[in-house]
Design a protein with these regions (language model features):
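Charged, low-complexity intrinsically disordered terminal segments
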Residues: 1-200
Length: 200
């Protein structure tokens, strides 16, 4: 069982957050010795959504055996106000933060992907370096393509993990027959995990 934490979260003063695929290290900026470049997606978030991202971090910290926050986290504590300050932004864009992990009994991310794909009206764009879907996700993509949705999948053309890359290719024939467009990113290593549905 793999219980490692693969999240990439930075929260600054409880009001600015960064999350996405970027690791910390020079090779993740310029590709290092193995790749000409490293393509990734990371987001900067400002506002109330930072509280939700901070909550994910605090739960991970607690579950990993970090400082016991239970006694410090009552609503009036200074630590609570420091970790979860009120937003000062006047701009608003609806956003939902979703996390999954061994601390949750629900596969929240998998469920939201299935729902979004099922609700797609025009297009689905997915980027992933390691495309190893379960049967349900594979069928979701096939059904979307067969129903006329423009489904596009991009994976890395220059892998860092050959086994995962070979496994991904075993799904190509089935997806192509269903009408999914598949692209290989050849300009360097594609590490981005990204999905856009109907341009959103």
């Amino acid at each position: 069982v793999n219980y490692r934490n693969h999240r990439k979260i930075v929260v600054i003063d409880g009001i600015v957050a960064y999350m996405g695929g970027m690791n910390l290290g020079q090779e993740y900026i310029d590709g290092g010795k193995r790749f000409a470049s490293w393509r990734d997606t990371h987001m900067r978030i400002v506002g109330d959504a930072c509280n939700l991202i901070q909550n994910v971090f605090v739960c991970d910290w607690h579950n990993a055996g970090g400082r016991d926050l239970d006694n410090l986290m009552d609503n009036g504590s200074s630590l609570m106000q420091e970790l979860f300050p009120s937003s000062t932004t006047d701009k608003y864009l609806p956003m939902q933060i979703i996390s999954s992990g061994p601390d949750s009994k629900w596969d929240s991310i998998q469920k939201i992907y299935s729902k979004m794909i099922a609700d797609a009206k025009e297009s689905i764009y997915i980027e992933s370096p390691y495309f190893v879907p379960d049967d349900g996700f594979l069928h979701d993509l096939e059904n979307a393509a067969l129903s006329g949705i423009n489904v596009n999948l991009m994976i890395t053309g220059k892998p860092d993990k050959l086994v995962a890359w070979w496994v991904a290719q075993t799904y190509f024939e089935t997806l192509l027959k269903a009408g999914v467009n598949i692209y290989l990113y050849e300009s360097g290593f594609l590490h981005s995990k990204f999905c856009a549905i109907d341009g959103r």
